[in-house]
Amino acid sequence: MYIWLDRALEYFSYLPRNEPKLQLWHDFLLWSASQVCEPLNRDLQIRIIARYGGDIRTLFMGAYRAITAGVAEDPAQNVLLHLAVEFGVACPSPAQYAGETIDQLFVQRVMDLTDKSDPDVALAAADGITIHLANCDKDYGSSMIAMANVVRNRFRANYQEKAIFVSGGDGNEYSYLAPFIQLAIMGMPCYASPDGPILCGDQQALFAPQSAFCSAEFFSSYWTKVRRAELWRMNRRM
């Protein structure tokens, strides 16, 4: 077992035993999302702490730091799926995502978005795209995490300017938060919302709804310019 996972489970072993595990897990995901989002959602954290008492902050923060270490150790692993399985609130994902397969899916997605038939030409033209995963129930966002790693590996110099990753919608409880938390820790532009994305005219999810948790990179100067350009383009159409 991973050292980071041992540490996270040690903190979890002190969680209130009289509370349902699934409720504790949902609140941990909400607390972690509010910790990693920009700006930090302190009001939500205060409400969660008030539900259990002050000790819960120490336990959640300890587990959160452990998963952060896990992402730093190997960003390709789905840290929250590992933790959910060991905590007993999820089953091992039946879906296995080979890096090659995800790479092919990403290239095809870029070719579709850029309307280029040549993969190399399409990748060179790929800027300002969004990747949306509506249903995270089956794999806790493993496919999105794998695709984010493909983006980081293919575009090492400017991977934060290639794609926004969006999870949420389709009534998938709190599992939509899992890929967001990991990708935000990885430094990727991303957001998560139970309401799903706001789609522009070209089906790009550049804008986040009010209910969204957003990573710091979502508000970078690059993506702010992209959104302004999209607003200008939409206004011209009116």
How should each PLM-predicted stretch be described?
Residues M1-Y159:
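Class I S-adenosyl-L-methionine
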Residues N158, L177-L231:
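S-adenosyl-L-methionine
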Residues F165-D170:
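Conserved SAM-binding motif I beta-strand of class I
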Residues R233-M238:
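Extended alpha-helical scaffolding regions
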